[in-house]
Swiss-Prot record:
Molecular function GO labels: ATP binding; proline-tRNA ligase activity
Family, per entry: Belongs to the class-II aminoacyl-tRNA synthetase family. ProS type 3 subfamily.
Recorded catalytic activity of this chain's protein: tRNA(Pro) + L-proline + ATP = L-prolyl-tRNA(Pro) + AMP + diphosphate
Protein name (database record): Proline--tRNA ligase
Primary localization: cytoplasm
Gene3D superfamilies from the UniProt entry: Anticodon-binding domain (3.40.50.800), Bira Bifunctional Protein, Domain 2 (3.30.930.10), C-terminal domain of ProRS (3.30.110.30)
Protein purpose: Catalyzes the attachment of proline to tRNA(Pro) in a two-step reaction: proline is first activated by ATP to form Pro-AMP and then transferred to the acceptor end of tRNA(Pro).
PROSITE patterns documented for this protein: AA_TRNA_LIGASE_II
């Protein structure tokens, strides 16, 4: 069990626990350039399954996949000024090739609204060309000052959807539709419950009219933004000239959306489900769903025969891994656990004498004897149980650690305790900044529907004369965040 000894208990030091899990769980290595990582098979396998699943979801909404260039001419990028200001501190630029300086700087893609705006301008002329609904799977570069594997790296992977519509209503509807799809995907596949809502003006995407978000609670109580969907309105179409003739033969500008999730989801899986033995990967998204371990096969040749038979049967429909190495049983078990494989089947001489094998759940570490004739059926049952248990545990943790604040003093105490704090708030940017400076908390989202706990709440900042009662109409979730 030496591998497990390399992991710092999460209760002792959550940040170090996270680092230990990602470096020991076949998830990543640090790249040679500072702030970059190498995605190893265990993490990239999850990402491949995310791609496969979301592509199926997207197709139901008429989404077509394309690929756009990595480089953006600086003059094109600068047209939408709010967008430029939002990304300017993180921009990487190409200024020289070989010994020759470029006549114009090239921006290395931090996001692709600009490229898609240029594409839409060329391809859209009439309402008959609409809607355009595109997605791309790509890498992006943002020069983060402080980096953390999967959560903030200078290069990361994501999908970004971009659409153009003939009306604001259609675009707004699509924006909401996609955030709901992300919420369902996180629940059904990643076993992660979320809080969803609209971003405040200060927190919305640079260049958006409005931003919708899904926010997950990590085991340390901090929030992680796990997906966003932006209604761009005509904020890009007007400056970039994306116009079309509508049904009345009048010139109009398209209404746009953009939406995406990234490899931050890998960090979310680790910090929502992981324990002191490593990552726990939900079965529906796991690259390896079942590990089959041969135990003391050198003492009984029947072990290998049975293990191979189980492997051949299960691998017809599931991703299964067979460990027939001569490593010790303890090493094999700890390797499976630290990599987060949802279920392992131990095939050993003693169990075979009783015509059974041992199932070990990764989520609870519970061991169960299963008759050989029932292995196939029970594997499917166990994977469903594990998936559901992971979600229910995360949901319970979210509910138990989401609280209401009745005044600013209570609010500060709850933030210190790393809670999600729901407060009535006027969404004044100045006050958001003050709260962040004092407590480290930021508004994660404005809730659409809230059931107050029977007490009339005043705006959390009313005590210092910041706002009037009638402005305190929004309920906002605050939390410290990654």
């Amino acid at each position: 069990m030496k591998q497990l000894e390399k992991i710092t208990p999460l209760e002792k030091d959550f940040a170090q626990w996270y680092t230990d899990v990602v470096t020991n769980g076949n998830l990543m290595n640090y790249g040679p350039a500072k702030g970059t990582i190498i995605y190893k098979p265990n993490s990239y396998g999850i990402w491949e399954n995310i791609q496969k699943t979301l592509n199926e979801v997207f197709k139901k909404h008429g989404v077509e996949n394309i690929y756009a260039p990595l480089f953006i001419p600086e003059s094109l990028f600068k047209i939408e000024k709010e967008h430029v200001q939002g990304f300017n501190p993180e921009l990487a630029t190409v200024t020289q090739v070989g010994n020759k300086k470029l006549s114009e700087k090239l921006i290395v893609r931090p996001t692709s609204e600009v490229i898609f705006a240029n594409l839409f301008k060329e391809d859209i002329n009439s309402y008959n060309d609409l809607p355009k609904i595109y997605n791309q799977w790509a890498n992006v570069v943002r020069w983060e000052k402080v980096t953390k594997p999967f959560l903030r790296t200078r290069e990361f992977l994501w999908q970004e959807g971009h659409t153009s519509h003939s009306s604001a209503e259609e675009a707004r509807s699509f924006t909401v539709k996609m955030i709901k799809e992300y919420e369902k995907f996180l629940k059904n596949y990643l076993a992660i419950p979320v809080v969803s809502g609209k971003k405040t003006c200060n927190e919305k995407f640079a260049g958006a009219v409005s931003t919708y978000t899904v926010e997950a609670m990590m085991k340390d109580g901090k929030a992680l933004q796990t997906g966003t969907s932006h209604y761009l309105g005509q904020k890009f179409s007007r400056p970039y000239g994306i116009s079309f003739k509508n049904k009345n033969n009048e010139e109009d500008f398209v209404y746009q959306t953009s939406w995406g999730v990234s490899t931050r989801l890998l960090g979310a899986i680790i910090m929502v489900h992981g324990d002191n033995r490593g990552v726990i990967i939900p079965p529906k998204i796991a690259p390896i769903k079942v590990d089959i371990l041969e135990i003391l096969a050198d003492k009984n040749p029947e072990v290998s025969k049975v293990a191979n038979k189980i492997y051949k049967e299960l691998s017809k429909k599931l991703s299964v891994r067979l460990d027939a190495s001569n490593k010790s049983p303890g090493f094999k078990a700890s390797q499976s656990e630290i990599e987060g494989v949802p279920l392992r089947i131990e095939v050993g001489p003693r169990d075979l004498e009783n015509n059974c094998v041992t199932f070990v759940r990764r989520d609870t570490l519970e061991k169960t004897k299963v008759d050989l004739e029932n292995v196939k059926k029970e594997v499917n049952n166990y994977l469903k149980l594990i998936q559901n248990n992971l979600y229910q545990a995360a949901k319970q943790r979210l509910e138990e650690n989401t609280v209401y604040a009745y005044n600013y003093e209570d609010f500060k105490k709850h933030i210190v305790d790393n809670k999600f704090v729901v407060v009535p708030f006027c969404c004044v940017t100045k006050k958001e900044i003050e709260i962040k400076e004092e407590t480290g908390a930021t508004p994660r989202c404005i809730l659409k529907k809230v059931k107050p706990r029977g007490v009339k709440l005043e705006c959390v900042c009313k005590s210092d004369g910041c706002c009037d009662d009638d402005k305190a109409i929004k309920y906002v979730v605050f939390a410290r965040a990654y």
